[in-house]
């Protein structure tokens, strides 16, 4: 398996999870990131020992990246995705939602197809056993009351033991 070079867009809450997870993955050769906020950029550089850039284009071109993860706030997904595709990245992971409008999503998909870029939108609960159980219950013929409780204390980073 070839090791990959990955760039993360955004050094906020989710961006930090992405940077940390990629930095711990033995299949990742290099991790870099970009963020417009100089304080966040400096903090992430110091915390993870990885290089930070100011723009997506600069990051992708300087590092010849294979993949980019877009982990900015929801309203700011479209432009970095477009910039990454236009800068030559071949794989793009986008935190949900892909974009704010159907038109923006369609534009990204067309641009990706034109440039042979693979896109994935991260719905991190998609594989969660509890969600699959609820989905099965909803589809079930046995109609019963389904109650749910939400917790905001779950860990997002992948345990490092998973890489062995």
Question: Regions from the language model: what does each represent?
Answer:
Residues 1-48:
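N-terminal Rossmann-like dinucleotide-binding module
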Residues 18, 50-111:
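Beta-loop-alpha module in the N-terminal Rossmann-like domain of NAD(P)-dependent dehydrogenases
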Residues 22-23, 59, 138:
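Hydrophobic C-terminal alpha-helix "anchor/cap" residues
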Residues 25-26, 62-63, 128:
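Acidic-histidine catalytic/liganding microenvironments
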Residues 28, 90, 117-118:
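Short, well-ordered coil/turn segments that N-cap beta-strands
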Residues 30, 49, 65-68, 142-145:
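Local beta-strand N-terminus motif with an aromatic residue
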Residues 106-124, 142-148:
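Rossmann-fold dehydrogenase core element
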Residues 125-164:
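Predominantly a Rossmann-like dinucleotide-binding segment in NAD(P)-dependent oxidoreductases
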């Amino acid at each position: 398996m070839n090791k990959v070079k990955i760039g993360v867009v955004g050094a906020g809450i989710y961006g930090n999870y992405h940077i940390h997870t990629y930095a711990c993955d033995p299949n990742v050769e290099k991790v870099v990131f970009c963020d417009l906020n100089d304080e966040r950029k400096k903090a992430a550089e110091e915390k993870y020992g990885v290089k930070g850039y100011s723009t997506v284009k600069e990051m992708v071109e300087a590092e010849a990246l294979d993949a980019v993860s877009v982990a900015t706030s929801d309203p700011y997904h479209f432009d970095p995705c477009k910039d990454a595709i236009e800068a030559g990245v071949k794989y793009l992971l986008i935190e949900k939602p892909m974009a704010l409008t159907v038109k923006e999503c369609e534009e990204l998909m067309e641009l990706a197809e034109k440039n042979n870029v693979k896109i994935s939108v991260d719905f991190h609960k998609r594989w969660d056993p509890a969600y699959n159980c609820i989905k099965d219950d909803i589809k079930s013929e046995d109609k019963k009351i389904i109650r749910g409780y939400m917790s905001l204390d779950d860990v997002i980073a992948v345990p490092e033991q998973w890489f062995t």
